[in-house]
């Protein structure tokens, strides 16, 4: 699956994890990491990638009965906000929050994320 270099992989991960604005701030760091980092086990990365693409746990979501907080990101180009909405629709009684101006790595990009999680855990 992965045919490029480690540097290509790092940049691709960053590009899909962050908003365009945030990626602009981190792109040089990821390029440096890509230059000095190495893929230790290419086969393992391929297995993980295939698992991400083929794994379907939708049937198990209806078996979740504990309080569940789903926090999605408006600009998530990995799962999309629709992915978070889909989880919410299948987990009875779940709470859904979509944070604006965030990408897939919303936990790193939005201070509101930590506040929302803390409020949920304390409730």
What is each of the regions a protein language model found here?
Residues 77-83:
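Conserved alpha/beta-hydrolase "acid-adjacent" motif
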Residues 33-57:
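Hydrophobic, aromatic-rich cap/lid helix
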Residues 56-65:
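The feature captures the conserved acid-bearing segment of alpha/beta-hydrolase catalytic domains
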